[in-house]
C-alpha cells in the first residue's frame, strides 16, 4: 500500500456528486470564498473539464497551464498553475476542457489515482484549506480528489431525482476508504437549489434527511437568481450580492463545515 505523507492543509474538501446540475460548482466557489474571507489562505482546485469554477474567478484564456498539464506533464506541477483570484486569500488552480481526455492519457499508469495527492504534498503548507470541484462523474479525476481529500461534501438538489446515483458515489467512497485513503470523512450533505414554496421540494428535503440523518447540514441553499448570476461577473456571492440570502446561506454553511471538521 502506498504511504500517506502529510499534506499540511487543515481541510481538503472534495465537492462531489456524479449528477450534474446540483449546485456543485456554486458550492465549491462560494465555500472556498467563505473560507478565504476568514483570513486563511485557500486554494480552489478545478477538476471539472467544463471549467466553470475557473471561469467564475479567472479569464482562463490567459492561463497557459492548467490542471490537465499537472496530470500529464511531469515537468508541470501544481505550483506552476496556481493563480491568484481577485478575492484576497483565494487562489485558483484552473481546469480546461482537455481534462475530459485525461482518463485515456493515463490508462495503465499505476500511480494515476495518486497524482493529485502527490502534488498537494509538494505545496508544503502554503494553503490552510483546499476545496476541490469534482466533475459530474466517478472517473479518475474524482478518484484523485477523494484519495487526496480529508473530507467530502455532497450537494444534493431538492428535486424529484435528488437521490439518483448517490449509491454509486457512496460505493466509490467506501472503496477509496478501504485502501488508498482510510481517513476520508463524509463531512456532510448540503441541500441545494431549494424552493421552499413548493410542497415537492419540502417533501424531498424530508426524504434526504431521512436517508442521511445527521449528515445533512442544517443550512439549506435556496434557489437564487443572484447565485446563478454571480459567476458571469467573476465574483463570489459575497462580493456580487453581499446582502442576499445566498451570501448568508453559504456563510452559514461555511460555519457548519468548520464546526464539523
Predicted regions and their residues:
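P-loop NTP-binding core
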Residues: 1-261
